[in-house]
Amino acid sequence: MNFSWLRRSPASSLPGLVAGLSLIILAVSVFAVIYSEGAGQGLTVDWAPVLSVLKMTFFQAGLSTLLSMTLGLTLAWSLSHQRVFPGRGFLVSLLSVSMVMPTLVAVLGLVSVFGRKGWLSQLADLFGGPGPGTFVYGLTGILLAHVFLNAPFVARALLQRLDRLPPDRLKLSASLGLSPWRQFCIVEWPAVKTSFYALSATVFLLCFTSFAIVLTLGGSPAFNTLEVAIYEAVKLEFDLARAVTLAMVQVLVCAGLVVLASSLRNDDGSLGVVSRVSLWPAPVGARVLQVVTIAIFALFYISPFLAVLWDGALADFGRLLHEAAFHKALVSSLCLATLSSALTVAMALAIGGTKRTLGSPLRVELNWGSRTLSSLLSFSGAIYLAVPSLVLGFGFFLIARKLTA
């Protein structure tokens, strides 16, 4: 490998290289510890239940991704055409909240709305109709929660792409008399296609590594995913051999998916930075579909927020504020969040700056060495999906177990 380009690379690139490669080394070390533990125990595990869990994990992740991407794309298309209505700005801003919302808060909100004693059940009792029953649990509950968290994220990202469509393209499609479907296929879909594929891979990985949602709403071992199965093997059964096997499968599958997702570029140089202005009204049928889509989604998305706020307003905050456990948890959360966010931002800026340097022919010589390091840095940015937090914690548990022994 030719490293001559390193002599021309700015010294400011070194922190990014150190940060990115450190993350990869950490992931490889965790995998090595898990593998060594498995090799020491012989990996004498019945593979039938492991394959069954893997099949269920792929199934729910694939179905969740399909539903999330379909709803997200439809909502983004609807919002891009319906530019003016009361609360549009608030709704678009609210779409970004799902990615920072704690998973358990989302689960509690969905249960408060769709649970056996939730708002929907009370509304059904009021009108004498059948309630949702256990709809929010099992596979339907898992899918519902995944769509609730991921569809807004998809819609927000795709809406930004649609808003950057040059007005000339829209003017040309209108002058040609294209139907809404033909306009979408010829003008709008090419603008969001690359983003759509990249987002699909990301959403699939998020659903594949889902833990809290499956644990709380799964309702049955039949719907266990790999992460939940690892948790049960360690926490409930202390079957380390099975946990090691599941963790190895999880890391290998996720790493392969991350490599595949990294190959999908999320860029399109043909788009401008102009704001889209809707000057040509769509046919009545298309407008009705857009309005109905926005209304149903707004009701589905906002009602769990309101349920959480309503339930929280009825809480005994006076007693909570005087509990020592609450004070300890609050201080711990603030300290961990502050330190983690500061370290994360610093490492992200360093990795991003180094990756930009490695991709610039004016700063480095573009050869196999620079491209390899650039690919490794891209992989390090998605390492949290390749080695999920539960698997990482399991690896640390094995390390601590060896040290204490």
Regions from the PLM with identified roles:
Residues M1, F238, L260-G285:
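Intracellular loop-helix junctions on the cytosolic face of multi-pass helical membrane proteins
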Residues M1-S12, I186-W189, L279-P283:
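Short, Lys/Arg-rich N-terminal segment immediately upstream of the first membrane anchor
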Residues N2-L6, G40-W47, C185, D316-L321:
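A short amphipathic helical element positioned immediately N-terminal to and/or at the very start
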Residues R7-A39, A48-D163, A191-G218, A243-A261, ...:
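Membrane-water interface segments at the C-terminal ends of transmembrane alpha-helices
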Residues T44, R161-L162, I186, T216, ...:
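Short alpha-helical segment immediately N-terminal to, or the first helix within
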Residues S112, A212-F238:
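Glycine-rich helix-loop "coupling/hinge" segments at transmembrane-helix boundaries
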Residues D163-V192, L236, L358:
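Short helix-to-coil transition segments within interhelical loops
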Residues K171, S179-Q183, D268-P281, D316-L321:
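Juxtamembrane inter-helical linkers in multi-pass membrane proteins
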